[in-house]
A protein has these predicted regions:
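Enzymes that bind and transform nitrogen-containing heteroaromatic metabolites
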Residues: 1-216
Length: 216
């Protein structure tokens, strides 16, 4: 069976924004964007990523854990890899996460500008794909070895894959906050027409987790 393309633990505001306005090096999630991730910052999964052994182990943590299970490769939009725009000036930028990113698999980064692969500690290898979303998915599936592929974002990248009908399941972590502006995830996309339905929803401590699945 072909591996699935999954969006997991993707945080949005109650008014549908997946990032705030004015994203830059100081505000990678945009103004107000960190509020979207408050549900994740308290989990044991997040704390463990940062070398600590505390954090909450409730529903939100369980949802976050499930998002990493069975994943053999990731796909990221370029903005999820870093703030650099245009041609790469050099290879000095190595991602937001330090020497050992939390992926531990091959990660395919969508970009218009070629760059050599980048091997990091812990099994992460960033591979830069210039041929578009279909090529990135084909390469990720080949690298995943039968496991699923996780699409990490950002908003524009998820929208591209949604509009192409390529995402099998979308897990949204809906935060009870209003952003008012920024990058809207589903604006102008008819999810029903694309064949998606709400498969389940779970109330967590700081977010409501909604799973949208494409009908077979």
């Amino acid at each position: 069976m072909m591996s699935k393309l999954l969006v997991q633990s993707f945080a949005i505001s109650i008014d549908g924004y997946g990032a705030g306005p004015n994203q830059d090096l100081q505000n990678p999630l945009g103004v107000g964007g960190p509020e979207l991730m408050e549900w994740f910052f308290h989990t044991h999964v997040w704390r463990q990523m940062h070398g600590q052994d505390d954090g909450e182990t409730g529903v939100d943590n369980s949802m976050a854990e499930q998002g990493f299970a069975g994943i053999g490769a990731w796909i990221l939009g370029r903005n999820m890899f870093g703030p650099v725009r245009g041609p790469w000036p050099d290879d000095s930028w190595k991602g937001w996460w330090g020497d050992e990113p939390p992926y531990h698999t091959p990660v395919f980064v969508l970009t218009h500008h070629p760059r050599a692969p980048l091997t990091m500690a812990g099994g992460t290898e960033f591979r830069f794909v210039t041929e578009g979303i279909d090529a990135a998915l084909d390469q990720a599936r080949a690298a995943a070895g039968g496991r699923d592929v996780r699409l990490g974002g950002g908003v524009a990248t998820v929208r591209q894959y949604l509009q192409a009908g390529l995402i099998d399941e979308l897990h949204l972590a809906i935060r009870p906050v209003l952003l008012g502006s920024g990058e809207h995830l589903l604006s102008g996309i008819d999810m029903r027409a694309l064949g998606y339905e709400c498969a389940r929803h779970v109330a967590g401590e700081r977010a409501t987790h909604v799973f949208l699945r494409r009908r077979a």
